[in-house]
Amino acid sequence: MSDQIKFIVDSLNKEPFKKNYNLITFDSLGPMQLLQVLNDVLAEIDPKQDVDIREEMPEQTAKRMLNLLGILKYKPPGNATDMSTFRQGLVIGSKPVIYPVLHWLLQRSNELKKRAYLARFLIKLEVPSEFLQDETVADTNKQYEELMEAFKTLHKECEQLKTSGFSTAEIRRDISAMEEEKDQLMKRVERLKKRVETVQNHQRMLKIARQLRVEKEREEFLAQQKQEQKNQLFHAVQRLQRVQNQLKSMRHAAADAKPESLMKRLEEEIKFNSYMVTEKFPKELESKKKELHFLQKVVSEPAMGHSDLLELETKVNEVNTEINQLIEKKMMRNEPIEGKLSLYRQQASIISRKKEAKAEELQETKEKLASLEREVLVKTNQTREFDGTEVLKGDEFKRYVSKLRSKSTVFKKKHQIIAEFKAEFGLLQRTEELLKQRQETIQHQLRTIEEKKGISGYSYTQEELERVSALKSEVDEMKGRTLDDMSEMVKKLNSLVSEKKSALAPVIKELRQLRQKCQELTQECDEKKAQYDSCAAGLESNRSKLEQEVRGLREECLQEESKYHYTNCMIKNLEVELRRATDEMKAYVSSDQQEKRKAIREQYTKNITEQENLGKKLREKQKAVRESHGPNMKQAKMWRDLEQLMECKKQCFLKQQSPASIGQVIQEGGEDRLVL
């Protein structure tokens, strides 16, 4: 209990309370002062509890504190009967009740602050089921539950952000930088608006630019969707290939293997899996649980200093030495009996370690095989993306090689044919050049003949006329085809329009009927809604009146209950004071001297006489000190002068005894002397 009180006093003297208590002053606090201290601690956890209990009824104070302690999940010691005493002790400010509560609150104040904060938003309001029959109340209650769930998720995200390393200073700097950037952008936008307003049709151009931006955003969104679908397709292809490879390997194994080998392999797999499940995994799980238990234990304990760690290390070393001594003693006692058993144990431990090592090696090999298969799958997908082909394996590669050989022979033949064609092409090209040269000479001769005859340019004009007539015939043919196509297109469009009209006629007729029906239903709905609103308003007014009456009656009931409990507490306090007064009167009136000595009056009178005698002695002592003060000061001064005189004589004597003064004549105030 003393450690508990010491912890409470130390905590109350620190921030944010700064009470400046010690053990005696804290122990001498009255019930109301203790309750005020408890209320201050609760107000530090939940700011809504910051009230002066002198301005509050005791029952209301106890009810408020009990409600908050219930929210904070404080469990009073004892059973149901102790709960009533706990409530009563909380009302009257009993120390055995208040001290454990203060100790519990001050030990985990940060955790309780968080719990009190969450309780403001996560304690669900109980709505009676008859009120939930109303649709408005039900919708509001549903919205309230959804907001509560949203608060839970937001609080989790907030805690994750707090633990993720982001500091508020960095966020504030980012916000200030964003605000500056926002101001700059607003200024730029204003300048651009002023520049754009001078341009003609700027509204239309802004509208087009807005549409362009929307379309670009839509294009980016579609590109993102396309990329996501590509990724999904890629993953689906990977899964498909993985499953196909598994199926192929299983078919290959089933085709090549016999039932005996399959059974043997299955038995080996079953043995390995059973060993992993029954021996290896439970051991690892047990070790992880122990490690977790130790870590939780370390986290729950308070932080240790260097001295505590040194003390724990010394204890661990002592325990290890004791264990080693006990093991040596046991081995010395049981060495002749358990010699063979220790050998067998060593062999069994070696075998178990080898078994565990092989199991781990097999597990690592399986993981490595799986990673290699994933890598092969990635490489095959990359090759497929690059050139659209797949990596061949086994028999497929052999077939590919044989096919490649046959294609190489065909390639050689085709290459030979191409060489022949190239040679023939060279001959034809040379023939073409010769014919062009011959044509040029003939054209030159023709032009000279035309000049001689006086009809120069006749051949050129003839060629141009032929070329233009050919072009005109081609254009006329194209025009005719275009007109035919246009007429056919018009016919098709007319037929489509007539078909759509005939198809939409019953739909339009049905739509008219539905519109008429919709108007009737909306009119009926408006009438029903008006009736509902009037009825709901009447019921709401009645409900509000009833709620006010119930609220008033509850407040009266609470006031009467608080008065009743306060009266009971005052009666008990008066009974205690009356009992003490009667005991005092009995002791004072009693003829027995022992009883009289126990009386408080006698004790106080005795203390008063003792203090008076002590004061008288002290005054006499003070008088004696005052009388002897002057002579004592004079005597002290004389002693100091004597000490100075003796010190001066000592210095003179030391000078006389020094060797530097031998053979010198020393002349002082009295006589002349020769020191030999």
UniProtKB/Swiss-Prot annotation:
Subcellular location, principal: other
Sites of N-acetylserine modification: 2
Location of region: Disordered: 611-632
Keywords noted in UniProt: Acetylation, Cell projection, Cilium, Cilium biogenesis/degradation, Coiled coil, Cytoplasm, Cytoskeleton, Developmental protein, Differentiation, Phosphoprotein, Spermatogenesis
Acetylation listed as a keyword: yes
Keyword presence, Transcription: no
Domain notes: The CH (calponin-homology)-like region shows high similarity to a CH (calponin-homology) domain and mediates binding to the globular domain of tubulin.
A Pfam family it matches: IFT81_CH
This protein's encoding gene: Ift81
Family designation: Belongs to the IFT81 family.
Subunit note: Component of the IFT complex B, at least composed of IFT20, IFT22, IFT25, IFT27, IFT46, IFT52, TRAF3IP1/IFT54, IFT57, IFT74, IFT81, and IFT88. Interacts with IFT74; the interaction is direct: within the IFT complex B, IFT74 and IFT81 mediate the transport of tubulin within the cilium. Interacts with tubulin; the interaction is direct. Interacts with IFT57 and IFT70B. Interacts with RABL2/RABL2A; binding is equal in the presence of GTP or GDP. Interacts with IFT88. Interacts (via the IFT74/IFT81 heterodimer) with RABL2B. Interacts with CFAP61.
Superkingdom to which the source organism belongs: Eukaryota
Phosphothreonine: residues bearing it: 61
A cellular-component GO term for this protein: cytoplasm
Designated name of the protein: Intraflagellar transport protein 81 homolog
Phenotype caused by lack of the gene: Mice show impaired spermiogenesis, abnormal sperm morphology and significantly reduced sperm number and motility. In addition to oligozoospermia, spermatozoa show dysmorphic and non-functional flagella.
Regions annotated as coiled coil: 133-258, 306-388, 433-453, 497-628
A biological process from GO: sperm flagellum assembly
Protein's cellular compartments: Cell projection, Cilium; Cytoplasm; Cytoplasm, Cytoskeleton, Cilium basal body
GO molecular function: tubulin binding
Tissues in which the UniProt entry reports expression: Highly expressed in the testis (at protein level). Co-localizes with RABL2/RABL2A in the midpiece of elongated spermatids within the testis (at protein level).
Basic and acidic residues bias locations: 613-629
Annotated region (CH (calponin-homology)-like region), positions in chain: 2-121
Function as written in the Swiss-Prot or TrEMBL entry: Component of the intraflagellar transport (IFT) complex B: together with IFT74, forms a tubulin-binding module that specifically mediates transport of tubulin within the cilium. Binds tubulin via its CH (calponin-homology)-like region. Required for ciliogenesis. Required for proper regulation of SHH signaling. Plays an important role during spermatogenesis by modulating the assembly and elongation of the sperm flagella.
